[in-house]
């Protein structure tokens, strides 16, 4: 992909890039009262023009009428405006009203047909396009959407991490799964990465911590929903912060250096990294030993006509390892994730053992 760095298409860029404004543009009065208090704190004002809801019957946006309100405000008080587009018609209207930045929503990213239509509508466009992660943690879909826009000649590209849907109980509206966007950034280092703490959190009190975590991970910017009266918002009321509090939130965030510069710190860092490398080696050696033992168990089960999956054994492992984790002051959820991965690999390994033996038997019968 051909990707321009954020500083090359947003000349005023100073980390972090801030995109903020109401979830939905509800009325002209609400837009003004939500936006005016934050204009000196943001790079782009965001606002939902169309708001497709999970189920019909709720407020779904004002459409072109809301863009007219935005245009009226921009004539009086210049600012850059960002909005979501989901159809070629949305793109056409965005161009008509001189919108400054577009983003692609999670529900759109998940559908390659929709993305292809939008990419065609934006063929060769210079307007920046940010692509939100798909609803579920499918990195290939996220990359595929970005690649479609890149092939259409859109060079001012970026990605928005808004978290992922999960059926697991969580304090978040969408679980962060930080490693997924970091994998994307690792593959495309120039790609601007923006965090949407509002959609990850689902609750205003969680927004600052998520925003700080994103900056700790060297994200390029933040998209935060702000409303003049969040408790009266027509959509996503629980996750929008009061507009007058945006400045306090931003002032409370700590910016980290992108790299170490002092020699004494670098020297100490290298010592710690060597210890981490050694610890990782020991972990991998332990996993290798475990897989060898799993293979032996697979052979023993096959020879004695015993099923691969033993529920009682799995429950025993699941419970005892959590107790061990607690004794070692390790996060239980983290340990459970590791256990599930190890168990999946163990089942796969034993299945391969069963299949290998059957193949040998078939060969000998030939």
Identify the role of each PLM range.
Residues 60, 79-87, 91, 100-115, ...:
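Catalytic beta/alpha-barrel core
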């Amino acid at each position: 992909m051909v990707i321009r760095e954020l500083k090359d298409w947003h000349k005023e860029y100073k980390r972090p890039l801030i995109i903020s404004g109401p979830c939905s543009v509800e009325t002209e009065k609400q837009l003004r009262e939500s936006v005016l208090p934050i204009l000196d704190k943001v790079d782009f004002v965001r606002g939902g023009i169309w708001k497709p809801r999970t189920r019909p019957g709720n407020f779904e946006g004002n459409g072109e009428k809301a863009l007219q309100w935005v245009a009226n405000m921009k004539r009086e008080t210049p600012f850059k405006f960002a909005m979501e587009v989901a159809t070629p018609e949305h793109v056409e209207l965005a161009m008509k009203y001189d919108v400054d930045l577009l983003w692609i929503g999670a529900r759109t990213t998940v559908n390659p047909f929709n993305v292809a239509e939008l990419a065609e509508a934006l063929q060769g466009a210079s307007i920046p396009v940010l692509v939100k992660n798909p609803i579920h943690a499918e990195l290939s879909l996220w990359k595929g959407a970005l690649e479609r826009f890149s092939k259409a000649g859109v060079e001012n590209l970026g990605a928005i991490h808004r978290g992922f849907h999960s059926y697991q109980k969580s304090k978040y509206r969408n679980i962060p799964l930080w490693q997924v966007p970091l994998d994307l950034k690792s593959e495309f280092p120039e790609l601007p990465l923006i965090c949407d703490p509002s959609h990850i959190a689902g609750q205003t009190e969680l927004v600052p911590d998520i925003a700080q975590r994103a900056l700790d991970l060297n994200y390029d910017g933040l998209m935060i929903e702000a409303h003049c009266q969040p408790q009266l918002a027509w959509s996503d009321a629980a996750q929008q912060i009061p507009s007058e509090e945006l400045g306090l939130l931003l002032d409370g965030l700590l910016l980290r250096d992108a790299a170490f510069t002092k020699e004494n710190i670098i020297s100490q860092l290298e010592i710690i990294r060597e210890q981490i490398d050694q610890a990782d080696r020991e972990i991998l050696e332990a996993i290798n030993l475990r897989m060898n033992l799993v293979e032996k168990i697979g052979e023993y089960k096959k020879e004695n006509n015993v099923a691969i999956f033993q529920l009682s054994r799995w429950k025993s492992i699941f419970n005892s390892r959590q107790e061990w984790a607690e004794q070692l002051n390790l996060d239980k959820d983290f340990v459970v994730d590791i256990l599930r991965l190890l168990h999946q690999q163990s089942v796969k390994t034993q299945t391969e053992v069963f299949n290998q033996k059957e193949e040998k038997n078939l060969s000998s019968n030939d």
